[in-house]
A protein has these predicted regions:
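A generic local structural motif
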Residues: 1-3, 131-134
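Conserved N-terminal/central alpha/beta ligand/cofactor-binding core
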Residues: 2, 6-10, 28-35, 39-123, ...
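Glycine-rich Rossmann-fold phosphate-binding loop(s) that bind the pyrophosphate
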Residues: 17-20
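Short glycine/serine/threonine-rich phosphate/pyrophosphate-binding segments
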Residues: 22-25
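Residue-level signal for short segments within beta-strands and strand-turn junctions
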Residues: 40, 129-131
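Flavin (FAD/FMN)-binding glycine-rich loop and adjacent Rossmann-like elements that form
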Residues: 48, 111, 123-126, 133-311
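Short, charged helix-to-loop "capping" segments that act as catalytic/coupling loops
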Residues: 103-106, 132-136
C-alpha cells in the first residue's frame, strides 16, 4: 500500500540537504525575503561539520588565516565563540540550529529525507519527504529547488544529470587525470575523540575491533613520538573509495567502526604510546563521506581552473 501524503507545504525556495552548503543557502534565501524550506535527513544541521561527524570547517583558512570563508560561515564561527567558548560539539549543533530556525522566512524539517519528486516541462513541481520521527509523508511545493544533499538525492529522483567516480583525463583536458574512467571516489571516515584523565584507564576492545599490526600502523602515525595521538583527529582512518559510497555505505561504516576501535586498541595496548591516562571519549557511528554523486551543472570545474591562477 502506498503511503498517502499527510501534509503539504508551499515555499518559494526548497533546499534538500542541511549540511553547511544547504544550511547557508537556505539562510541566505530567507534573509532576502524568500519563503524557504530546508529539508535535512539528520536530527541536526551541519552535515560533516555537525556533532555527529565532527569535522570542523577549515580548508585553506587553516594554513592562511585571511583565506578563510566569510559571510554566513564566518557569522557561524563568531556565534560559536560567543555561545560555545569551550568548543563543545553538542553546543555547536545548537548554534547551527539557532542561526537557521531563528530566521522568520525559513521552515526547517529535520529527520526528513527526500524520497521522490514530480517534474513538468523540465521543472520540479514538488518533492516528497518522509519524516522518520513523525511517520509523515510531506509534499513540498516550491518555485526553485537546490540539491545540497551531498548524495544528490533530488537529482537522483529527477531527470537532472549527475555523475560519480573519476572521469578520464581526455574528457576535460586534465593532464593529471586517470587514463580510463572508473568508479573510485574519496573514502569515508568514522572519527574518534580521546580525552586525558587523572588516572590510568584500561581499554578492552569490542569483539568487532580490527587487530592492527605495527607494520600497518607505522604508515599512519609516528610510533617514535609517544604522544602524537593527543593532537590527532584521526582523519586518516578512511575506507571505501573503491566501493559504491552510497549503496555500500552501511558496509563501509561497519569496516570503519572496526578500524576506529582497532586504532585506539593499538594506541592503548601496544606499549608504543604514552596513553595510560587517556580514554576513548567518543566514536562516530555515522560515516562522514568525502565524496558522492556530483550534479552536472551549467559549468564543470576542471583542473585548469584551479592551477592556471586566472581566477
Amino acid at each position: 500500500m502506498e503511503i498517502e501524503v499527510n501534509e503539504t507545504y508551499r515555499a518559494q525556495f526548497c533546499v534538500i540537504g542541511g549540511g553547511m552548503a544547504g544550511r547557508c543557502a537556505a539562510v541566505a534565501g530567507a534573509r532576502r525575503g524568500v519563503k524557504t524550506a530546508l529539508v535535512q535527513d539528520r536530527p541536526v544541521l551541519g552535515g560533516n561539520a555537525s556533532g555527529e561527524v565532527r569535522m570542523w570547517i577549515r580548508g585553506a583558512g587553516h594554513h592562511f588565516p585571511f583565506y578563510r570563508e566569510g559571510g554566513i560561515v564566518e557569522e557561524l564561527a563568531m556565534a560559536n565563540i560567543r555561545y560555545n567558548p569551550t568548543l563543545s560539539f553538542g553546543v555547536w549543533d545548537g548554534v547551527l540550529y539557532d542561526l537557521a530556525a531563528g530566521e522568520k522566512n525559513l521552515k526547517v524539517f529535520l529527520n526528513a529525507t527526500c524520497t521522490g519528486a514530480k517534474e513538468e516541462n523540465g521543472r520540479i513541481l514538488y518533492a516528497d519527504i518522509w519524516q522518520l520521527t513523525t511517520y509523515k509523508k510531506l509534499r513540498i511545493f516550491a518555485e526553485y529547488f537546490a540539491d545540497c544533499s551531498g548524495d544528490s538525492i533530488l537529482s537522483y529522483c529527477t531527470s537532472a544529470a549527475f555523475t560519480s567516480g573519476r572521469e578520464d583525463k581526455a574528457r576535460y583536458g586534465e593532464k593529471d587525470g586517470v587514463s580510463a574512467a572508473d568508479g573510485c571516489t574519496m573514502g569515508s571516515s568514522c572519527l574518534i575523540q580521546v580525552r586525558e584523565t587523572a588516572e590510568k584507564v584500561p581499554f578492552t576492545p569490542p569483539s568487532f575491533a580490527r587487530k592492527l599490526t605495527e607494520e600497518e600502523f607505522r604508515y599512519r602515525m609516528d610510533t617514535n613520538s609517544r604522544g602524537v595521538f593527543r593532537t590527532d583527529n584521526f582523519w586518516w582512518m578512511e575506507l571505501g573509495g573503491a566501493k559504491d559510497v552510497t549503496r555500500d555505505a552501511e558496509e563501509i561504516k561497519t569496516e570503519l567502526l572496526a578500524l576506529a576501535y582497532g586504532v585506539w586498541d593499538y594506541i592503548k595496548n601496544s606499549g608504543k604510546f604514552d596513553s595510560d591516562n587517556w580514554t576513548l571519549d567518543w566514536v562516530s557511528f555515522l560515516g562522514g563521506k568525502r565524496e558522492s554523486r556530483r550534479v552536472v551543472g551549467e559549468y564543470v570545474l576542471r583542473q585548469d581552473d584551479l592551477v592556471s591562477g586566472r581566477h
